[in-house]
Amino acid sequence: LTATSGDTGKAAMEGFCDVAGTKIIVFYPDGGVSAVQKAQMVTQGGDNTCVAAVRGNFDDAQTAVKQVFAEVGGESLLAGKGVRLSSANSINIGRLAPQVVYYFRAYADLVRRGTVAVGERVDYVVPTGNFGDILAGYFARELGLPVGTLVCASNANNVLTDFIRTGRYDKKRPFYLTSSPSMDILVSSNLERLLF
């Protein structure tokens, strides 16, 4: 089960398309993805893929998916029927590992090209919605990569940039549909992983 603001949904459905023993259901906010993203998802082939629009925004779709995972007793009920659930989006911490790796790869490429010297710090500006990619940069720094400043870039739904600036997380604010739907988020799944 996964919620998407566009790109993850198509990528996940394509990745699991006709893979034996799997099914994938993707939920996206109706009116909250681009026309191209919607077309890619609703025309996805595969006997094991399903996509559905939900009323509301990405946060509503993601909250519903999280509730399925949090359902008390639901996991054992599903396991009894041979069903195990996973998610392809930011609520799955397994998604962070490859994101950490590409910070190291990007740094190695900069060193190889002679753009930076080994040990020289590099700043990263990261468009941020669910806080996963920038959190991966933080983890890369904790693992020893010479990361300088991590800049959290946002759009009009700037709940994270406001939080970083003020220390106050205020999700009760106007929600805007923008031309960058992956950042059209007010409830960031990965921020709690940094704080706790």
Say what each PLM segment does.
Residues 1-196:
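PLP-dependent amino-acid enzyme catalytic core
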